[in-house]
């Protein structure tokens, strides 16, 4: 009775939610939603966008740099210059201090520079493109991780729902048996002990049902979390459990497995390209740099602050030129930077080798785990079929008076355990199948 009330409550709540237009998701739709709304995935995409803007930032250094400057000077003490005394009739070798200038000086101008040659600039621009590729690979890996997490969470909900459905069927069947046994007991055709045994079995099954209902609710929350969906809003699933493809040992061969298909390996390769360009950047830092410089300004000098007097003159100033910078000695700083960059490349080479070995081992382990999971699933499915046959036969014998309630309870428990074993094996097989696809680099976005 408790199970029926609880199930009715679930149906009532479901209908209430349905009136609020519950959003229904297929697995494909759930994955697409997660790829758009997952906060962690959005952050990796923002990292990619930041890398793109970094390229624009570095590129801007090679474009003309134009600035406007305004300089106002007030000389509290006008600068003094020493003029040879013979200009004023003084003895040769003497100097006379004379102040030149006026207190107020205002200069307004525009300066411009253009980088003509700098080896570090061109290499740095290529390096930022490599960093952009690196962040894009990381973004792709995050998408695969999101697909994996959502797929597993979706399947977990389907399987926990299936287990809940099976438990509900068991409860209904056991409740019917319990009611019939109670009638037989009251009529004097069954012992009280038989009825009590069935009641204990029913209560235990009710407890399992309650636990399964809580696990189903938790599975829904986990799915919504992986999707980036609001936890306080209900959802419904439209897909059913997919059939696992029949995979034989030959079809699980790793003969054509290539670690380079994995995004983790591609990320390290992109990192290597960035490190190579970083080394090149330090090496070309020994080359000179050449910059074109120019300035155009106008200047006014006044005894008083009357720069807005249009009747007084302003004097133009203009120049163009080149600035050549040749590195001579920096205390071996660039030599140390080159050595560090080479060592980073060696580390990357070791990382590539280690990752190749690790990915190969992961693929082999995924193959073994999948084979074992499929074998276990076949066994558990057969056990479930046998347990169901035993239960149906035992129930018929009990109705005919050829078997006791003890045998009925035992058959019911065996069937319940077989159901649990089957659903657990089913979840494991689906989860391991996803891991196998990921290990071989076969997991992709739904079309």
Please give the residue ranges for each predicted region.
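Terminal intrinsically disordered/low-complexity segments used for targeting and assembly
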Residues: 1-33, 69, 81-92, 213-253, ...
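Bacterial Sec-pathway N-terminal export signals of envelope proteins
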Residues: 18-71, 77, 231, 237-278, ...
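Periplasmic alpha-helical coiled-coil/stalk elements that build and connect Gram-negative outer-membrane
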Residues: 29, 53, 145-259, 369, ...
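Short segments within alpha-helical structural elements
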Residues: 60, 207-229, 384-442
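Small/polar, glycine/serine/threonine/aspartate-rich low-complexity segments that form flexible
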Residues: 20-22, 69-110, 240-248, 293-326, ...
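Sec/SRP-type N-terminal targeting helices
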Residues: 42-46, 59-60, 103, 116-143, ...
């Amino acid at each position: 009775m408790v199970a029926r009330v609880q199930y009715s409550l679930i149906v009532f709540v479901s209908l209430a939610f349905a009136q609020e237009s519950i959003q229904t998701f297929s697995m494909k739709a759930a994955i697409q939603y997660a790829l758009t709304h997952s906060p962690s995935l959005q952050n990796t995409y923002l990292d990619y966008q930041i890398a793109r803007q970094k390229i624009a930032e570095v590129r801007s250094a090679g474009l003309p740099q134009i600035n406007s400057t305004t300089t106002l000077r007030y000389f509290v003490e006008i600068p003094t210059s020493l003029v040879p005394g013979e200009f004023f009739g003084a003895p040769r070798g003497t100097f006379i201090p004379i102040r030149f200038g006026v207190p107020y000086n205002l200069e307004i101008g525009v300066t411009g520079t253009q980088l003509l040659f700098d080896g570090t600039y061109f290499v740095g621009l290529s390096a930022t493109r490599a960093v952009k590729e690196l962040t894009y690979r990381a973004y792709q890996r995050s998408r695969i991780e999101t697909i994996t997490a959502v797929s597993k969470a979706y399947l977990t909900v389907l399987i926990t729902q299936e287990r809940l459905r099976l438990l509900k069927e068991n409860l209904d069947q056991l409740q019917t048996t319990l009611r019939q046994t109670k009638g037989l007991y009251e009529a004097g055709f069954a012992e009280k002990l038989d009825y009590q045994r069935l009641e204990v079995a029913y209560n235990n099954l009710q407890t399992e049902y309650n636990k399964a209902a809580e696990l189903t609710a938790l599975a829904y929350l986990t799915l919504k979390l992986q999707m980036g969906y609001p936890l306080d809003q209900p959802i419904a699933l439209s897909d059913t459990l997919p059939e696992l493809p029949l995979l034989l040992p030959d079809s699980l061969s790793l003969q054509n497995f290539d670690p380079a298909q994995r995004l983790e390996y591609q990320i390290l390769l992109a990192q290597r390209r960035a490190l190579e360009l970083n080394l090149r950047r330090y090496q070309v830092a020994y080359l000179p740099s050449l910059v074109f410089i120019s300035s155009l300004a106008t200047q006014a000098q006044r005894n008083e602050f009357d720069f807005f007097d249009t009747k007084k003159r302003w004097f133009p100033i203009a120049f163009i030129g080149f600035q050549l910078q040749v590195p001579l000695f920096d205390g071996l700083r660039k030599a140390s930077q080159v050595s560090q960059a080479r060592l980073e490349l060696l580390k990357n080479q070791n990382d590539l080798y280690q990752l190749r070995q690790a990915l190969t081992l992961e693929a082999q382990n995924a193959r073994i785990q999948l084979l074992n999971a499929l074998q276990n699933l076949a066994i558990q499915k057969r056990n479930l079929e046998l347990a169901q046959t035993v239960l149906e036969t035992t129930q018929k014998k009990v109705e005919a008076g050829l078997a006791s309630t003890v045998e009925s309870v035992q058959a019911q428990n065996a069937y319940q355990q077989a159901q649990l074993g089957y659903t657990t094996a089913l979840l494991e097989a689906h989860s391991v199948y996803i891991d196998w696809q990921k290990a071989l680099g076969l997991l992709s976005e739904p079309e």
